[in-house]
Protein backbone atom coordinates (compact mmCIF):
# COMPACT_ATOMS: atom_id res chain seq x y z
CA UNK A 1 0.00 0.00 0.00
CA UNK A 2 1.41 3.44 -0.89
CA UNK A 3 1.85 6.05 1.81
CA UNK A 4 -1.26 7.95 2.77
CA UNK A 5 -1.19 11.72 2.72
CA UNK A 6 -2.90 13.49 5.62
CA UNK A 7 -5.91 14.42 3.46
CA UNK A 8 -6.32 10.74 2.48
CA UNK A 9 -6.75 9.42 6.02
CA UNK A 10 -10.46 10.17 6.61
CA UNK A 11 -11.68 8.83 3.25
CA UNK A 12 -9.39 5.80 3.63
CA UNK A 13 -10.97 4.97 7.02
CA UNK A 14 -14.51 5.41 5.70
CA UNK A 15 -13.74 3.35 2.59
CA UNK A 16 -12.22 0.54 4.64
CA UNK A 17 -15.21 0.33 6.96
CA UNK A 18 -17.70 0.53 4.07
CA UNK A 19 -15.92 -2.15 2.01
CA UNK A 20 -16.06 -4.52 4.97
CA UNK A 21 -19.75 -3.75 5.51
CA UNK A 22 -19.35 -2.45 9.05
CA UNK A 23 -22.68 -0.61 9.29
CA UNK A 24 -25.14 -0.46 12.21
CA UNK A 25 -25.04 -3.70 14.23
CA UNK A 26 -22.07 -5.17 12.34
CA UNK A 27 -19.07 -3.68 14.08
CA UNK A 28 -15.36 -4.15 14.56
CA UNK A 29 -12.79 -3.25 17.18
CA UNK A 30 -11.47 0.30 17.15
CA UNK A 31 -7.99 -1.26 17.14
CA UNK A 32 -8.64 -2.77 13.69
CA UNK A 33 -8.92 0.61 11.96
CA UNK A 34 -5.20 1.21 11.34
CA UNK A 35 -4.50 -2.34 10.19
CA UNK A 36 -3.33 -2.40 6.59
CA UNK A 37 -1.90 1.12 6.76
CA UNK A 38 1.79 2.02 7.01
CA UNK A 39 3.05 1.71 10.60
CA UNK A 40 4.16 5.34 10.79
CA UNK A 41 0.59 6.51 9.98
CA UNK A 42 -1.23 4.53 12.69
CA UNK A 43 -1.30 7.28 15.32
CA UNK A 44 -2.68 9.81 12.81
CA UNK A 45 -5.30 7.27 11.72
CA UNK A 46 -6.47 6.73 15.30
CA UNK A 47 -6.74 10.50 15.85
CA UNK A 48 -8.75 10.88 12.63
CA UNK A 49 -11.02 7.98 13.62
CA UNK A 50 -11.72 9.61 16.99
CA UNK A 51 -12.66 12.80 15.15
CA UNK A 52 -15.01 10.82 12.89
CA UNK A 53 -16.70 9.51 16.04
CA UNK A 54 -17.12 13.08 17.32
CA UNK A 55 -18.45 14.17 13.91
CA UNK A 56 -21.02 11.36 13.92
CA UNK A 57 -19.74 9.39 10.93
CA UNK A 58 -18.68 6.47 13.12
CA UNK A 59 -20.81 5.06 15.93
CA UNK A 60 -19.23 3.57 19.01
CA UNK A 61 -20.33 0.64 21.11
CA UNK A 62 -18.46 0.23 24.39
CA UNK A 63 -18.06 -3.41 25.38
CA UNK A 64 -16.36 -5.26 28.21
CA UNK A 65 -13.56 -6.24 25.79
CA UNK A 66 -12.95 -2.81 24.24
CA UNK A 67 -14.47 -0.18 21.99
CA UNK A 68 -16.36 -1.47 18.95
CA UNK A 69 -17.24 0.82 16.05
CA UNK A 70 -19.43 0.87 12.94
CA UNK A 71 -20.45 3.38 10.30
CA UNK A 72 -23.50 5.56 10.92
CA UNK A 73 -26.10 4.35 8.41
CA UNK A 74 -28.00 7.64 8.72
CA UNK A 75 -25.00 9.41 7.13
CA UNK A 76 -24.53 6.83 4.37
CA UNK A 77 -24.94 9.32 1.51
CA UNK A 78 -22.37 11.72 2.98
CA UNK A 79 -19.94 8.86 3.60
CA UNK A 80 -20.20 7.62 0.01
CA UNK A 81 -19.78 11.18 -1.33
CA UNK A 82 -16.52 11.55 0.62
CA UNK A 83 -15.29 8.18 -0.62
CA UNK A 84 -16.22 8.88 -4.25
CA UNK A 85 -14.55 12.32 -4.24
CA UNK A 86 -11.40 10.72 -2.83
CA UNK A 87 -11.40 7.86 -5.36
CA UNK A 88 -11.98 10.19 -8.32
CA UNK A 89 -9.17 12.47 -7.10
CA UNK A 90 -6.82 9.48 -6.78
CA UNK A 91 -7.78 8.28 -10.28
CA UNK A 92 -6.79 11.66 -11.75
CA UNK A 93 -3.45 11.70 -9.92
Model-derived regions: residue spans:
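A short, conserved structural fragment
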Residues: 53-63
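Short helix-coil junctions and helix-kink-helix linkers
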Residues: 30-43
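Short alpha-helical segments that sit at the start of domains
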Residues: 1-23
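Minor-groove-contacting beta-hairpin "wing" of winged helix-turn-helix DNA-binding domains
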Residues: 65-71
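Short, hydrophobic-biased segments on the C-terminal half of alpha helices
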Residues: 46-50
